């Protein structure tokens, strides 16, 4: 089984045109085994097949890696650690804060951090809005995957976005409705808040996944 997973991961990485060292690939597969081991206890993923996790969890997250800019990354609603853990594994020169309000999931994330020896990862158990109320840490980028609507994410992340942090949101089908809602939010609040514009939308082609994937970059215009 392990050999098959290694082949699946290696092939997917080649198709994504990424270069990932063998030791990092081993950590990625170790991470999947940890998800499988603790899934029932911590309710980490609706996907139970480790073979399906290779494209749906690992490759889906790794497809975002070329778009990670800056050195201080905040992954909100991190859940089982997606995309934060895979991105931290393949970007050891960047620092990642994995944020989730579910205590069980952050306990799992801490176990992953220790097991994979990820010195560039910090795990925080907090709601997003409460985190920004308490902490003054500056981030270059906020990431999220299947977390909430674009407008909701912007509202709860408005404090860092207003001072230059950018948001990179992983979505499925092209989010026409969510973009329209964000434009309505901007129009209604432009007199009192910053305007949060969609800077770029990239369609991602993820090996082993037939459904649509889009990456939405949002930043403040003032």
Task: Pin down the residues of each PLM region.
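Short conserved AdoMet
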Residues: 69, 91, 162
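Conserved beta-strand/loop positions that form the S-adenosyl-L-methionine
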Residues: 76-78
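Class I SAM-dependent transferase core
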Residues: 2-70, 74, 104-107, 111-121
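Conserved SAM-binding loop of SAM-dependent methyltransferases across substrates and taxa
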Residues: 80-93
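S-adenosylmethionine
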Residues: 94-97, 101-222
